[in-house]
Amino acid sequence: MSFRSPGAPTARMPRRSRLLAPVGAAVVVIIAGIMFAANFWTEYRWFGSVGYTTVFWTELRTRALLFAGGALLMALAVGLSVYFAYRTRPAYRPFSLEQQGLDRYRSSIDPHRKVFFWGLVGGLALLTGASATAEWQTFLQFANATKFGAQDAQFGLDISFYTFTYPFLQVIIGYLYTAVVIAFIAGVVVHYLYGGVRLQAQGQRVTPAARVHLSVLLGVFLLLRAADYWLEQYGLVFSNRGYTFGASYTDVNAVLYAKIILFFIALVCAVLFFANIYFKNARVPLVSLGLMVLSAILIGGVYPAIVQQVTVSPNEQRLERPYIQRNIEATRAAYGIDGAEVIDYDAQTELTTAELAAEAETIPSVRLVDPAVVSQTFQQLQQVRGFYQFPQVLEVDRYTTSDGETVDTIVAARELDGPPSQEDRWLTRHLVYTHGFGMVAAAGNQVDSEGRPVFLEYNIPPTGELSQVGEGYEPRIYFGREGAEYVIVNAEAEYDYPVDPDTPEVPTTEDAVVPTPSPSPEADEAPAPADSREEGSAQEQQDQEGQDGGEDAQGTEEEQSGQGSGQANNYYDGKGGVQLKSFFDKLMYALKYQEINILLNNAISNESQIIYVRDPAERVEKVAPFLTVDGKAYPAVVDGRIVWIVDAYTTSDRYPYSTPIDLAQATTDTFTESTTAVNALPGNRVNYIRNSVKATVDAYDGTVTLYGWDEEDPVLQTWSKAFPGVVTSKDEISDTLLSHLRYPDDLYKVQREILERYHITNADAFYGGQDFWTVPNDPKPQAGNNPEPPYRQTIRFPGDDTPTYSLTSTFVPRGRENLAAFMAVNSDASSEDYGQMRILELPRSTAVQGPGQIQNTFQSSAEVREVLLPLEQSSAQVTYGNLLTLPFAGGLLYVEPLYVQAGGSDASYPLLQQVLVGFGDQVAIGSNLQEALNNLFDGDEAPLEEPTTDGEAREEEEQPQASSDLAQALEDAAEAYEEGQAALREGDFAAYGEANERLKEALDRAKAASGSNEEKDE
């Protein structure tokens, strides 16, 4: 141990060391300030480039106002409390061990008390202000509230009070609570530190000034508690105590009265604390405070629990009936399903020839091409170069072809996947390879003779139906779902597209073999496609295309640099980016992206633009932060331009009596779990949702337009007041755009989950729960244990004269697998019946199989196994497509395409080879839908093919030499079987299919000849 000699100088820290901390802190602050400035400036420039500066400034002003309000509230509350406690400190403190110990702290704090004071007040103010800015949307909704025109069932208040006003009042009371509590704690600490409160004193323990100060703070706290009790009674409409969400019997008959009683008790306690300023006796208010706490436990907690246990539980159904009914009605209204029509549907399981003939006209519209399977086919046939890509799940839209027919269409945008790997560097990634090129579209109900999609729009430069709009068509895609990184345009020459690309020949409408032909003689007499006559087998084509595609995908350095095969370049002339007008702009973006090349690259001039926030959904979210955006934007050609269509929702979690739902859970299905192309909604709990906005994002210039779709929605009206001019009127939607708008997937998935229970509108039946449904798991073997996604298809609903473009789904009973119901919603936005939701409810005793059961029947059927077994034993990969369910001839028909992909080659892709169908308890398989249906209905082809005349029938009966015909037929069958097996071993699926057709035809002839022999013997 060492001692410092008296008078010896104190060791001092070197000057450099003493400056290190403040200099370091200053550097950190400066860097943070510069980064904040860069972010602020680039955000402002971006909003200016898209024309939504109103959103930027409104949000900024609101956040600044709330920051100032929250900071001022906390600063005043804590600052005044500390200041008053210090100024009223006693001049004389009685001597005690307690005060002796505190003297050391006082001597340390006093010289720096101003620093401590402003540090404490400033720090708390900053934290509170920053926290308050998060409530900017709550404040704007409160300030611009729009009435719903409907009242809650308990208090009779307009729904807007609960949706807009109630949440803001909760926020205000919460911040006042926090400020008073912290002010009280700070006051107690200062009073204790300076002797105003003495815990070990023999006489007076609290000085008069401290008593007044703390009594006022406790009185204010109790006034706030009283206000909170009063507000909590309205919050009972969000209670989850009862059988359903919302105020229950116990809430209305016990908790409500408890809140009112506690409100008055809190008021009395507050008055007693204020009176303590004059009466100078803290016992009475403190005792009253203890009694209030006890009352809150007994009246607010124990009493309702007794009522629930003793009164409600033994008589729950009778007592909860009116409250269950309130919940049913509110939930159906909040989710927009109150107009859903439930139709009793006793689905038949057998058909007559006449019934089948009546449905023949709907057969050609069945969408067999599965958008979740053919992505790889699009990739192989239409990728063109290896740096283009298609999403894993394509989209289903509708287009009117040049012959005037409107068809379900599988569409995808050919987006950029970054530069070739050997050229992947900063310049090529951000300045050269900047955009995708063109749309690709295929008919949803047609394939060619080998099972490939029939393309309506294809190739580079674009060819086909979608681009036939004259000179104005713009195929370039600068904004898309794969646009995660920024690009800088009008700098280097941009790669546009390959000149004279060596792309594989693709099937078009001239090559189509409709798998579901209409029952006309002309269709039966159609010649075989040129592909099948001239080009050889599908496998040979796949191998050749794979070689071409492999060369395209890998490419030579010469090709991908723009030499050799050549390339077209492009200079952007749109307004979709932020112009880099000055060195300052370049500096700000270099800081934002931490990329020095933005400053150093000489090609970047004052005319260059930086394009970022390129994902359509993200772009809409940014200009409309009050909206929840659907997980799947889809492309469409509208008036000669590719646009992305984005559905957006207004939501709330404050709709009285409506059951809340987790959006992420409700919108999760096979696609969201197995691919990155479809996203579930964010995991927010809401109990109100509307598809209030349809947004478009131009793929070339990034223009964002928000159309008010549900203009009667009070939530949208509220936001339109807060952000005037941001949402465009629905009347501005063009007819072309309207034809591509559709019922949104995520809204439908939310509604179908609610309808699992809320298709029941009677409280007693709802309480019983025997008729609850569930969405079945996707039955496909590759789907995993995920809910089946909804499917878009054109169907004819029972009782309708014409087919309707619909979004469909099925339900099974909870705990069972047979089919309970089929639901369809009109998805044609140009129709007056858009959004009409109809549900076919089957009897409990139905024999109709559910999706899981029919899939199991498909896979275990001897007829199906006979066809699939040779494929599965080979190297081929068999993929089950979307299992479609559709009303058909008084029953429900299941249709599932079957795809086959050759193994052993990266260049192979799925081909539609077979179609599975099921009706009632019968299943069948065929090379197309017509054949599958003929097999399903005992080979009765009369409704689907040209009928045979009576004369022809007599002629066939009179044909001689039945025995020789039988022998010849059997010989042909054996020959066809051998040829089919040989083709299968070689992987030639086209030849295999043809051999199977000859085998079937030979067996039919053999059966006919055998029947003729039997008649002769008789």
UniProtKB/Swiss-Prot annotation:
Localization terms from the record: Cell membrane
Transmembrane parts of this sequence: 20-40, 64-84, 115-135, 171-191, 212-232, 254-274, 287-307
Acidic residues composition bias: residue spans: 542-560, 939-959
Presence of the UniProt keyword Transmembrane in the record: yes
An example Gene Ontology CC term for this record: plasma membrane
Membrane-protein topology: Multi-pass membrane protein
Region listing for Disordered, in residue ranges: 497-570, 939-965
Domain of life: Bacteria
Keyword Membrane: yes
Entry keyword set: Cell membrane, Membrane, Transmembrane, Transmembrane helix
HAMAP family in the record: UPF0182
Record family assignment: Belongs to the UPF0182 family.
Protein name: UPF0182 protein Tfu_0541
The species this protein was found in: Thermobifida fusca (strain YX)
